[in-house]
Amino acid sequence: MEYQSGKRVLSLSLGLIGLFSASAFASDSRTVSEPKAPSSCTVLKADSSTATSTIQKALNNCGQGKAVKLSAGSSSVFLSGPLSLPSGVSLLIDKGVTLRAVNNAKSFENAPSSCGVVDTNGKGCDAFITATSTTNSGIYGPGTIDGQGGVKLQDKKVSWWDLAADAKVKKLKQNTPRLIQINKSKNFTLYNVSLINSPNFHVVFSDGDGFTAWKTTIKTPSTARNTDGIDPMSSKNITIAHSNISTGDDNVAIKAYKGRSETRNISILHNEFGTGHGMSIGSETMGVYNVTVDDLIMTGTTNGLRIKSDKSAAGVVNGVRYSNVVMKNVAKPIVIDTVYEKKEGSNVPDWSDITFKDITSQTKGVVVLNGENAKKPIEVTMKNVKLTSDSTWQIKNVTVKK
């Protein structure tokens, strides 16, 4: 695999990815193939009115295995407040149609005056779309979901992203809604849909089993703080494939939290990342196992392949495979960092069985291997890792095997 004019040039074997079904590289224990959109139970037509209650009623009345289809009418935009997906029911957004979040903080608050403010909590907003304890639900395109993160709120003098910037300055937390929040669910699908301008994280899959994002496009400015692309948290059996992700934070961030399930069996296959903070594991790493990242192009991310944590959130990371990755204009192509934010705590990183194979960075960068806080020296295996001659290495308490 090589990089050419920002596009893929694949070998014959990878040229057959249209036939992909649970690639040999996969760590996801499921057999995963390209999803198919379900048939619709009803079709809604867009007009100029706010459609929250109309869409929610249609979702509640839709039979399992079916989808509510959003199509163009007198308008191509559905304006809506927070929505909840029932179990077994999906949302299908037609070509050229946008489901747009209302730009009103009050609509998202989960307690009086809790959303659209900066405080020490940061949990005062409902997500735009929530799925909790669902099985076989999903969101399908080829339409778009727009979080309006950069638009001034009607009931505030600032945008969601302004709040995030203000929180950073004040060392507090912004109360801004995530775009899609999936909790304790099984076999959730995101297919052929575009996600733009999220106020906060775009997609979170938390405490679940079975998540597929396929042909998903995420595009949010690099300056939009805390706008992670896709974050699997304390979950298992995840596939992110054939997707294109550009954000203002981690393109993908795999996390595992204390007191919750381990995160395991993750496949990140045949993707392209633009701006963002890279393909990350952490900073919550209290049990991450069996991760495969294969056939990835990264252009303009601040970091490339990164495992990050510190004493406040570290734990076991084991069985991580990176292969066939090409990077360009990536400041730090490879990062292993046990002192990510220098936070204090009693947790010790225990990271092992980490392999980098057939990795190319085409522009100058810095490789950071910092095992300062590790339980024991971290061993990483590097095979056919190609960097430019002017790239540099920073190594502390890490052993590199070839």
UniProtKB/Swiss-Prot annotation:
Database matches in Gene3D superfamilies: Single-stranded right-handed beta-helix, Pectin lyase-like
Please write the reaction equations for the catalytic activity of this protein.
(1,4-alpha-D-galacturonosyl)n+m + H2O = (1,4-alpha-D-galacturonosyl)n + (1,4-alpha-D-galacturonosyl)m
Q: Classify the main location.
A: secreted
Q: State the source organism's domain of life.
A: Bacteria
Which InterPro entries has this protein been placed in? GH28_Enzymes, Glyco_hydro_28, PbH1, Pectin_lyas_fold, Pectin_lyase_fold/virulence
Q: Where in the cell is it found?
A: Secreted
- Signal: is it a keyword of this entry? yes
* Gene Ontology CC annotation, any one: extracellular region
Q: What Enzyme Commission number does this protein have?
A: 3.2.1.15
Active site per database record: D249, H277
Which UniProt keyword terms apply here?
A: Cell wall biogenesis/degradation, Glycosidase, Hydrolase, Secreted, Signal
Its signal peptide is 1-23
Q: Name one GO molecular function term.
A: polygalacturonase activity
Q: Name one GO biological process term.
A: cell wall organization
Q: Which PROSITE patterns match?
A: POLYGALACTURONASE
| UniProt xrefs under SUPFAM superfamilies | Pectin lyase-like (SSF51126)
Per its UniProt record, what SMART domains does this chain match? PbH1
Describe the family membership recorded for this protein in Swiss-Prot or TrEMBL: Belongs to the glycosyl hydrolase 28 family.
Quaternary context: Monomer.
Protein role: Involved in maceration and soft-rotting of plant tissue.
Query: PANTHER family, alphabetically?
Result: PECTIN LYASE-RELATED, PLASMIN AND FIBRONECTIN-BINDING PROTEIN A
The molecule here is called Endo-polygalacturonase
Starting at the broadest rank, the lineage of the source organism is: Bacteria, Pseudomonadati, Pseudomonadota, Gammaproteobacteria, Enterobacterales
Question: Corresponding gene?
Answer: peh
